Design a protein with these regions (language model features):
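Generic structural signal for well-ordered secondary structure
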Residues: 14-18, 54, 140
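A structural signal for alpha-helix termini and helix-coil/disorder junctions
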Residues: 27, 46, 50-51, 67, ...
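Metal-dependent phosphoesterase signature
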Residues: 53-87
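Active-site neighborhood of HAD-like aspartate-dependent phosphohydrolases
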Residues: 1-49
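Alpha-helix termini
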Residues: 20-23, 27, 63, 115, ...
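Short, compositionally biased "basic patch" segments
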Residues: 36-63, 113-121
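C-terminal cap/substrate-recognition subdomain and adjoining C-terminal extension
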Residues: 1-3, 73, 77-189
Length: 189
């Protein structure tokens, strides 16, 4: 089956959905600020001290999910933020299937992907009640592993990403075009 493959954050969504979702939830539920020390420990532990994995850092960042109904909040978030999807991304008007593969959690981006008509969503499997990741963070080579497992019958015509370095492995799956997104603008690599 022929498809175009898209990263999500800063590719089809003009922004970083994880941090924007957190800010959205913080405005609605100010008490989640109590998770900030744990979130900071995760960020510093990974990015500064290199003592914890990216996966664990992400779990600590999303620890605030324990205090909210994350799936309900995700629905509300996309009611407000759907206009930040890039105008050129319109799966229902494509001549081939649309696959989104993202490091963002499934629960967080599924509402907008469903609304827009994405045919297949492959993303980080995170428990929306705990913030714990089931399996691996869907990033870099893990994206290729997941695509081969969950989209084995797909052939990817064009691949779109904002980051040709971290998404280098999925760019290699393109049979026609590799497209770099910067500031919402597309350019062929």
């Amino acid at each position: 089956m022929l498809a175009d493959l898209y990263d999500f954050d800063k590719t089809v969504f003009d922004g970083e959905s994880g941090s924007e979702f957190w800010l959205f939830c913080l405005k609605r539920h100010p008490s989640i600020i109590r998770f900030l020390p744990k979130q900071a420990a995760g960020l510093f532990g990974h990015y500064v001290f290199r003592k914890i994995s990216k996966k664990r850092s992400k779990e600590l960042f999303y620890s605030y999910l324990k205090a909210i109904d994350a799936e309900k909040e995700a629905e509300l978030f996309w009611e407000e933020k759907a206009d930040k999807m890039n105008d050129w991304f319109n799966p229902r008007e494509h001549d081939v299937k649309t696959v989104v593969c993202s490091a963002s959690p499934v629960f967080q981006i599924k509402p907008v992907c469903d609304k827009l008509g994405v045919d297949l969503l492959i993303a980080t499997r995170m428990n929306p009640s705990t913030g714990l990741i089931e399996g691996e963070n869907c990033k870099s080579t893990e994206k290729v592993f997941r695509l081969k497992k969950e989209a084995a019958d797909y052939e990817f015509r064009d691949v779109y990403t904002d980051n040709p370095v971290s998404d280098g492995p999925i760019l290699e799956l393109a049979t026609r075009k590799k497209i770099h997104i910067q500031g919402g603008k597309r350019s062929e690599i």
